[in-house]
Amino acid sequence: MMMMQSRKIWYYRITLIILLFAMLLAWALLPGVHEFINRSVAAFAAVDQQGIERFIQSYGALAAVVSFLLMILQAIAAPLPAFLITFANASLFGAFWGGLLSWTSSMAGAALCFFIARVMGREVVEKLTGKTVLDSMDGFFTRYGKHTILVCRLLPFVPFDPISYAAGLTSIRFRSFFIATGLGQLPATIVYSWAGSMLTGGTFWFVTGLFILFALTVVIFMAKKIWLERQKRNA
């Protein structure tokens, strides 16, 4: 059984390496792919929502596909800010469709991070996220146990993608991870999409602040529940 599992991991690992090699070849040899990746990285580096909007919109009928690919790109390169894409989607496609696009694409990105970590192991993940960041994510899993994914998804200041990578290094089942991710990120996606499509200036930050307050309240409640459960087990 263990041998079969190990063999399957190696098959997945080889597949990922082949895909990565194919992407590098496409970036080097295909002008369209080269331009897309370079423009994507430049838009993120500028931390400019309007710049990302213009970039997505420039692809016309393929704008939604480009937005989806951008979310996948930022998931793999964890330091890139996903909220810029969420705001851009809301502005371009409206609160509902933009929010749905952001939610589904971020779910796909989270699943990819989980899969990469599970197949490639800690050494590769540390190179993608940084050892310090990954160690801090380990601390969340130690503190919150099985509730970690849901708790961290509700906290807007906890990095989204490193948690996905860290989860892939644990024994958590993919199904549990995926459900907790979907539920946990839904409130933030709704608020950011609504705020991004309708609000500006001080009102936007007021609504965002309310969401952060709500998220902290939920996390405090869950932390208390987890603490009480541990007290009962230790009694």
UniProtKB/Swiss-Prot annotation:
Please state the span of the N-terminal signal peptide per the UniProt entry: none
List the membrane topology term(s): Multi-pass membrane protein
Q: Which domain of life is it from?
A: Bacteria
Task: Please give the residue ranges for the topological domain Periplasmic.
Answer: 1-13, 86-95, 198-202
- Keyword flag Membrane: yes
Stretches assigned to the Cytoplasmic side: 35-64, 117-176, 224-235
* Notes concerning its domains: The VTT domain was previously called the SNARE-assoc domain. As there is no evidence that this domain associates with SNARE proteins, it was renamed as VMP1, TMEM41, and TVP38 (VTT) domain.
The UniProt similarity line reads:
Belongs to the TVP38/TMEM64 family.
What name does this protein carry? TVP38/TMEM64 family inner membrane protein YdjZ
Origin species: Escherichia coli (strain K12)
Q: What is the lineage of its organism?
A: Bacteria, Pseudomonadati, Pseudomonadota, Gammaproteobacteria, Enterobacterales
The gene behind this protein is: ydjZ
